[in-house]
C-alpha cells in the first residue's frame, strides 16, 4: 500500500525520531561496550568477515587510523604476486556485502521510523542490518569493519549544541 500523505500523528512522530537519533549522535554517555561489540561482530559476520579482534578507539581519528592500519597490514602481508588478485577479490567481496548497509547508515532513523510507524516490512537480511545499525547508534559513536577486526569508537566527552545545532565536540 502506497502512502500518499502522513497523518498529523505520524508527522508529529518524525520529530520524536529526529530528536531520539540526534540525542544518540550527541550522547556523551560512555559506550555500552558489550552491546556495541555484539552488534559489530554480527555486522562483520553478515559481511563475511571473521573477527579476530575488537579494537576500541578513543576518537574517530584514532578509529580511522586503526582501520587504515588494518588494511595496510593485510596488504603488507601479501606477497607481491598474490596481492593484486587477492586484494581485488577480497575488496569486491567485502564491498558487495557492506555497500548497501553502510551507504545509508545516516538514514537509520528514517528506516526505523518507516518500520515502526508506517509498518514497512523489510526483507530478513535488511531488517537484521537495520537492527544492528540501530544497536551501533545506541551503544557507541562509530564502527569500522576491516579484515579480521572491528574497530569501535567511544563516544565524545562533550557535545555542545546551540539552537539545535552541534557546534563543538570533544574527546578525551
Predicted segment positions?
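Short, glycine-biased loop/turn motifs at secondary-structure junctions and
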Residues: 1-172
Amino acid at each position: 500500500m502506497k502512502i500518499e500523505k502522513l497523518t498529523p500523528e505520524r508527522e508529529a512522530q518524525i520529530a520524536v525520531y529526529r530528536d531520539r537519533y540526534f540525542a544518540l549522535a550527541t550522547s556523551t554517555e560512555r559506550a555500552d561496550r558489550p552491546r556495541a561489540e555484539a552488534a559489530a561482530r554480527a555486522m562483520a559476520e553478515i559481511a563475511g568477515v571473521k573477527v579476530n579482534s575488537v579494537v576500541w578507539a578513543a576518537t574517530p581519528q584514532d578509529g580511522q587510523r586503526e582501520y587504515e592500519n588494518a588494511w595496510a597490514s593485510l596488504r603488507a602481508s601479501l606477497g607481491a604476486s598474490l596481492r593484486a588478485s587477492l586484494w581485488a577479490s577480497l575488496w569486491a567481496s567485502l564491498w558487495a556485502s557492506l555497500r548497501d548497509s553502510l551507504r545509508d547508515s545516516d538514514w537509520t532513523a528514517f528506516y526505523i521510523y518507516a518500520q515502526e510507524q508506517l509498518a514497512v516490512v523489510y526483507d530478513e537480511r535488511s531488517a537484521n542490518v537495520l537492527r544492528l545499525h540501530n544497536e551501533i547508534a545506541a551503544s557507541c559513536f562509530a564502527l569500522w569493519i576491516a579484515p579480521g577486526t572491528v574497530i569501535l569508537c567511544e563516544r565524545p566527552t562533550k557535545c555542545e549544541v546551540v539552537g539545535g545545532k552541534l557546534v563543538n565536540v570533544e574527546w578525551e
